[in-house]
């Protein structure tokens, strides 16, 4: 239930969907399995295993999940069958098979195999935090995060969400913190970072499980490199990697949060309820602190 990586979008708090209205809209875009000649199918599915509902509400949070099912049809399989058919025509009819005919044969083979192809599925989850006005997506890859945002907009007929565009760039803030050897407020340096230089061949330095205040690490910044990823700990509650794109990776929720969730959840539903609230609230407060150190939002 705890997101291990996060992309987030600030929302218009005055135009957030209610749980029932959101569920009704998502029901119109519910997931169905791939049919016949479909290469893939995508739609909303139950975000928790113990309930068939498409929205899992917990106080001021709403959890949703987008499922995608794709047909797996290896190109090598199609190529082998095509070669067999071409050879058969050449042998039986004593003629060559042209490019256009090969393409037609390839399409026929694909259409024949698709209904019987194996499938693979993936899912992306998101939580609406209506108190703070954020959509938290359980994926740091921009394509995946943008996809569920697009699907939500389509289902709802619109959703006012924006990219997290701050006055100061995350890279600039991270570089400054590493250079000065400490962070501001409730943040502390952890033990991982990535730095990049400039030029035609961009030099990349990755530091793992080291003291980030050490001279050999700080020297990279003094030599002109900028920090693109930085390991941070927030108020002894969350450890994570902040990226230059303002996404969070390798998130670890430390014992204090885990124990609080467990103390408030007696069964699967109760634990999911408590975990969702604690995760959404703590992450959102942490993000707001980061935004303040980044100079606030761009107008």
Curated annotation (Swiss-Prot):
Keywords associated with the record: Cytoplasm, DNA recombination
GO CC terms: cytoplasm; nucleoid
Segments forming a coiled coil: none
Cellular localisation: Cytoplasm, Nucleoid
Its biological purpose: May be involved in recombination.
Keyword Magnesium: no
Main location (coarse class): cytoplasm
Protein name: Recombination-associated protein RdgC
Keyword Cytoplasm carried by entry: yes
Classification via InterPro entries: RdgC (IPR007476)
Family membership: Belongs to the RdgC family.
GO biological process: DNA recombination
